Design a protein with these regions (language model features):
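Switch/coupling loops of ABC transporter nucleotide-binding domains
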Residues: 1, 27, 76
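Conserved acidic segment of CheY-like receiver
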Residues: 1-11, 16
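Conserved sequence signature across two-component system core domains
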Residues: 6-7, 32, 51
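Short helical segment in ABC ATPase nucleotide-binding domains corresponding to the A-loop/adjacent helical element
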Residues: 17, 21
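CheY-like receiver
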Residues: 22, 39-135
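Conserved Asp/Asn-Gly motif in the active-site loop of CheY-like receiver
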Residues: 29-36
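Interdomain helical linkers/hinges and coiled-coil/dimerization scaffolds
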Residues: 106-182
């Protein structure tokens, strides 16, 4: 799993990296010094699982970054941290689907608990994705079986293909059913 750590203060990033290593979270850590660089990273690399971002940064703040991630990378789990204790910031973090809002200075035990929860959530999401992909493969195999081993109408077959987003427009397709006699 990979975490993208975003803060304009290098010492903050180093401190969080230290905690990730201390608790042996087995995360690959990528860093960005502001929201704009982090957005570019998210555009370039598809392997980020967790986005941990500060709020106040130059060029693009953490809330704008989280909004971008929510809209363009909905699979990424977002955690926001900040020195702002006002409820309005926590509310804005919720609006961009952040799973947690940590206050600076970050409490070590709270950070550990949040990260354990988020890592478990990442694992669960990956497991669900694999299960969904396996079900789609099994369902497609069933579809192929039905195409060649049943007497479904062409309309039923075309509808099933559309469910899989297989576009048949402007394509010449012929279904032939041949029965063999022994």
């Amino acid at each position: 799993m990979k975490i993208l750590l975003v803060d304009d203060e290098r010492t903050e990033r180093e401190g969080i990296r230290f905690l990730i290593e201390k608790f042996q979270f087995e995360l690959e850590v990528a860093e960005a010094a502001n929201g704009k660089l982090a957005m570019e990273y998210l555009q370039k690399y598809q392997d980020v699982d967790i986005l941990l971002t500060d709020v106040k940064m130059p060029y693009m703040d953490g809330l704008q970054l989280a909004k971008y991630a929510k809209e363009n990378r909905p699979d990424v789990i977002i955690i926001i941290f900040s020195a702002y204790s006002e409820f309005d910031y926590a509310k804005k973090a919720c609006e961009v689907s952040a799973v947690n809002y940590l206050l600076k200075p970050i409490e070590v035990e709270e950070f550990k608990q949040v990260m354990e929860h988020v890592i478990a959530l990442c694992r669960q999401k990956k497991q669900w994705k694999e299960q969904k992909e396996n079900l789609l493969v099994a369902d497609k195999k069933l579809l192929l079986y039905r195409l060649f081993n049943t007497k479904e109408s062409v309309t039923e077959i075309v509808e099933k293909l559309k469910e899989y987003k297989i576009n048949l427009e402007n394509k010449y397709i012929c279904f032939v059913s041949i029965e063999t006699r022994n």
